Every structure is written in C-alpha cells, then in structure tokens.
C-alpha cells in the first residue's frame, strides 16, 4: 500500500471500536505516525516462527528507507495460545537490525482468525524526512517504494 489514505482504510478494516483499550492505544499510535510522517509504509505478514521472522526481514530489506524512522508494531496471536517471549524478541531484533536507531512502539493482542501456531504482524514505518530511494533513484515524499 502506497498512500496514507490507503493505509488508513486498511487499518480501519483491522481495528474495530469494540476492541479493548490496549488495542485502541495502538491504533492511536498508528494514526500519530500517519499524521506526522513525511512518508509511510505498511507491512503485514502472517505465519509461524521462524519463517515469520524471515518474511519480516525480507519485507524490511526491500524498503531501503532513511535513518529517521518511527515504527508501530502490533503482533497478534490466537486466543488459545500465547506469544513466546523469545519469538517476540526475535521479531523486534529483526526490526532493530533493519534500523538500529528506530523508535519502536509495540503491542500484542489476540486474533481468533489465526491458526493456533501462527502470529500476525502489522507494522507501520514512518520517516520524518524525505529522501532519494536507493532502488528507483526517485525523490520519495509521500510513500516508500
């Protein structure tokens, strides 16, 4: 998804007003990034570890973003299971390796639509500065490649 409006629309389909306060706070953080960032990228991945971490790494590597980043991460898991602390640390490490100076706000929640062994990640990256994309050599201001 390229534009902020497309990202907002997608987030509207993922969050409902009936969700608990923890999730609502995370949605407000997504909105904060969308309102203040010069450019944004939304990444969604779903699956079991360690494949999920590899997918996240591949998605992040393809972005070629600048250095000043804010990241909002929502990790979801099936209500009948629980999230492993080691798995959560692995996912946050992938993000940190991608951008060591990144500001990360994260939260966890349940999603009954997931398989019991799967996680889903909803990650929004916002950059406060415009830059030249290393891949396409174009000036990027509204969206990331």
PLM-predicted stretches and their roles:
Residues 1-145:
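Tubulin/FtsZ superfamily GTPase core signature
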């Amino acid at each position: 998804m390229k534009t902020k409006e497309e990202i907002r629309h997608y987030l509207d389909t993922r969050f409902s007003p009936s969700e608990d306060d923890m999730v609502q706070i995370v949605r407000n953080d997504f909105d904060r990034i969308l309102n203040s960032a010069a450019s944004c990228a939304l990444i969604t991945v779903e699956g079991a570890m360690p494949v999920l971490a590899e997918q996240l790494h591949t998605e992040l590597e393809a972005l070629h973003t600048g250095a000043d980043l804010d990241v909002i991460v929502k990790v979801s898991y099936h209500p009948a299971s629980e999230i492993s602390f080691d798995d959560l640390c692995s996912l946050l490490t992938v993000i940190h390796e991608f951008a060591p100076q990144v500001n990360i706000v994260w939260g966890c929640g349940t999603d009954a639509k997931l398989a019991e062994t799967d996680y889903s990640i909803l990650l929004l990256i916002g950059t406060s500065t415009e830059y030249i994309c290393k891949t396409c050599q174009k000036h990027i201001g509204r969206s990331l490649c």
